[in-house]
Amino acid sequence: MPTEPYIQPMHVLNEAPILCIVGPTGAGKTHLAMSLAEHAKSIGLTIELISMDSALVYRGLDIGSAKPTKAEQDAFIHHLIDIIDPTEVYSAARFANDAKRLCLEIRERGNVPVVVGGTMLYWRAWAHGLSSLPPANSEIRARLDEEGKSIGWPAMHDKLAKVDPETAARLKPNDSQRVQRALEVFEIIGKPMSVLLADSPSEDGREGSAIPSWIDLISLEPRDRKRLHLNLEKRFDEMLTAEFMNEVKALHANTRLHTDLPAIRSVGYRQAWEFLNGEIDAEQMRYKALVATRQLGKRQLTWLRAIEGRKTFDPFNPEELKAALDYCKSNLKK
């Protein structure tokens, strides 16, 4: 198996910290990044945006992922959008490698890298590195998958609890992907994944809740949760009128795609897939998609609030949103 090229650790760079804009889904991260890129252009700088979103990497997942439009992508340079097919898997480790490489290349061109997105596992991998987990073993994975289909994933979760109770305690019984991976790791190395993770230092030796010195983290965190939920509801309904279902139908027609793939498990797509399979009706699809979106936002906020030293702004407060943009502008002058 080919190895990823070595990427120089980012903390050795003797330059201004890299701006990273994060926040829950629907918080306006893309709008802030675009406004900053427009300002940069007006003062003779070129920003290159690096997407930190696990859905945007997939071709064909456009409307449901709120992917920047063609006009937006033409107006500003974007990276890590439409780079793989939905039949493929894009890992956090691959993102970390790609993002570090891009940051170095962008600065070598004399431009400004800005990372923007809300996939927090990608953030952790990029900012702190990941443990040296063994690569996937297709033979073991296929056998575990067949066993899971035969006895059910709750039963597989019980098996995991016997060999790695710590990992099992943080995973839901029906989280087939992660339960399978934990069992796979145990079979490959002969010890629990939790032990390996505990023994693995981050890239710069810091704890996962700290911000590395080479990153300037801007977090958009709405205080009005009700307004955020209403915005998400409005956005989903607008997606439905923007031919989102036709987009999913085109994906559904591809016999190589299924709900075990990360692309199809993306929020909105999974629920639409269930609707096209006849498992739920249209009303249930909308309800389940909105619930899943809210849960995603809650998980993102929980993760963000554990990060010490982040700079927070409420995107629904005009003064704070302006302050966020002003701060980002000042970052360009460093």
From Swiss-Prot:
GO molecular function: ATP binding; ATP hydrolysis activity; tRNA dimethylallyltransferase activity
Reactions mediated catalytically: adenosine(37) in tRNA + dimethylallyl diphosphate = N(6)-dimethylallyladenosine(37) in tRNA + diphosphate
InterPro entries (alphabetical): AAA+_ATPase, Dimethylallyltransferase, IPT, P-loop_NTPase
Keywords from the named record: ATP-binding, Magnesium, Nucleotide-binding, Transferase, tRNA processing
Keyword match ATP-binding: yes
Pfam families linked to this entry: IPPT
Functional summary from the UniProt entry: Catalyzes the transfer of a dimethylallyl group onto the adenine at position 37 in tRNAs that read codons beginning with uridine, leading to the formation of N6-(dimethylallyl)adenosine (i(6)A).
PANTHER family (alphabetical): TRNA DIMETHYLALLYLTRANSFERASE (PTHR11088:SF60)
Protein name: tRNA dimethylallyltransferase
Highest classification ranks of the organism: Bacteria, Pseudomonadati, Pseudomonadota, Betaproteobacteria, Burkholderiales
Gene responsible for this protein: miaA
